[in-house]
């Protein structure tokens, strides 16, 4: 992000949640990066951490909720990526991952480094107390300039915009005891069901 992400308040807010240290890209040049350039910067940042073998992201972090940031970073790193993850445990040289699927969950064992996009229920984050916040101010935070990562901003120009074509609504109100049956019939005839 821009220079504000390295402020004392941001540092304390992040490090008071239990992290040992922070490595931050705090550069005004990063303010207008698109998702691809942000992913390249994050991958370069991960490479700076010796022995890093897992990158945890939120399920829809900084990419306008598109759920693509974890996959983009994984692509730059050459690591596998798993999304919708509700639990992660270390197992020897790899990880045991519990992933939500349309039909329930599945457990995956993967060796080596991995990018994992966790769901909001993957962990309960404690609310930091005053002691945690004060101690966070003493923890190390290294700030990296975007130029030090070798990432160049990608120029994007919006060349046009279109609104979806408005569709005329039927404005049909179904009532009576058989309203549900009528609704199902109407949806079937419209090709929705």
Which role does the model predict for each range below?
Residues 1-193:
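N-terminal glycine-rich FAD/FM-binding segment characteristic of electron-transfer flavoproteins
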């Amino acid at each position: 992000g821009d220079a504000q992400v390295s402020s004392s308040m941001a540092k304390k807010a992040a490090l008071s949640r239990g992290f040992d240290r922070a490595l931050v890209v705090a550069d005004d040049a990063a303010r207008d990066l698109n998702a691809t350039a942000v992913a390249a910067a994050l991958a370069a940042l991960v490479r700076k951490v010796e022995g890093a073998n897992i990158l945890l992201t939120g399920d829809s972090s900084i990419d306008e909720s598109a759920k693509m940031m974890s996959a983009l970073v994984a692509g730059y790193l050459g690591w596998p990526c798993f999304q919708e993850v509700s639990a992660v445990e270390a197992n020897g040289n790899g990880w045991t991952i519990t992933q939500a699927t349309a039909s329930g969950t599945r457990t995956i064992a993967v060796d080596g480094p991995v990018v994992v996009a966790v769901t909001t229920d993957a962990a309960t984050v404690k609310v930091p107390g005053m002691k945690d916040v004060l101690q966070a101010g003493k923890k190390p935070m290294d700030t990296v300039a975007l130029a030090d990562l070798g990432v160049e901003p990608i120029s994007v120009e919006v060349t046009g915009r279109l609104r979806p074509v408005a569709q005329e609504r039927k404005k049909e109100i179904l009532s009576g005891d058989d309203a549900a049956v009528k609704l199902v019939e109407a949806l079937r005839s419209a090709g929705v069901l």
